[in-house]
Design a protein with these regions (language model features):
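Surface-exposed polar/charged interaction patches
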Residues: 43-46, 78, 145, 177, ...
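Extended, well-ordered alpha-helical scaffold segments
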Residues: 21, 25, 29, 119-124, ...
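C-terminal accessory extensions/subdomains outside the catalytic/core fold
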Residues: 94, 161-216
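Short, solvent-exposed segments of well-ordered alpha helices
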Residues: 16, 20-23, 80-91, 115-122, ...
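Long, repeat-rich segments with strong aromatic
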Residues: 94-179
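Alpha-helical bundle segments that constitute or directly flank the non-heme di-iron/ferroxidase center
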Residues: 1-13, 79-107
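Long, hydrophobic, well-ordered secondary-structure blocks that form the structural core
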Residues: 1-62
Length: 216
């Protein structure tokens, strides 16, 4: 996502301020991916039983990941910088990214003896929080625009109607992963509820209607 989502639009916005923020988002994602890749490499070299290439097969073939993979690939096909930023940082990251990172990995990793992954993921979450802050402020400003605010909110609603169902499908597709840890300290239902509640708060901040799909 750092390369094919944020980097692809970091010169597309109408002001340098927005472009610079998007460029920082790209750097955040690329650094996060690099941290994970280096940790994966260290494990592959240190542990004979660890398959450092298994994640590729999982991403390409595991049924639980295919709705997420499709959503990510569809994000990379969006040409409108504002829609891509909205659908990525506001919708996908809240309903899928943070669901997996915050509501699963950060909750169960240490309980299952992994104290390193939460450190790496926690850094990624901190970066995303900063990215969310500028994204929320940007779309809140557009929603409150005296001349075009109503049209902007209507447009955001159209984007939500397309992407909320897709991201919820991706989120629910990940449900089997919650049953894999030996110490199952959280349930998928609890995690999804926490993620959707945070998503509602973001939507309220940018003053758009809450999609009906979140109440189902």
């Amino acid at each position: 996502m750092g390369l094919h989502v944020f980097t692809s639009i970091q010169r597309s916005a109408p002001t340098n301020m927005i472009n610079n923020a998007v460029a920082v988002s790209a750097a955040h994602k690329l650094r996060f991916a690099q941290d994970l890749a280096l940790f994966n490499l260290d494990l592959a070299e240190a542990e004979e039983a660890f398959d450092g290439s298994a994640h590729k097969e999982v991403w390409q073939s595991a049924p639980e990941w295919q709705p997420t993979r499709e959503a990510v690939e569809r994000l990379t096909a969006i040409g409108d910088w504002a829609k891509l930023l909205f659908c990525t940082n506001i919708v996908f990251e809240q309903l899928v990214g943070s669901l997996f990172r915050t509501e699963l990995i950060m909750q169960v990793a240490a309980r299952n003896g992994d104290y390193i992954t939460p450190t790496i993921v926690g850094t990624g979450e901190y970066d995303y929080d900063r990215d969310l802050n500028y994204t929320r402020a940007l779309f809140q400003m557009l929603s409150r625009d005296e001349q075009y605010g109503a049209q902007n909110r209507e447009l955001f609603g159209q984007w939500l109607s397309e992407w909320v169902p897709r991201c919820l499908d991706a989120a629910r597709g990940l449900q089997p992963i919650w049953s894999q840890p030996a110490d199952k300290s959280v349930t998928f239902a609890t995690s999804l509820e926490a993620a959707t509640e945070k998503f509602r708060d973001v939507l309220k901040a940018i003053e758009v209607d809450i999609p009906e799909e979140l109440n189902q």
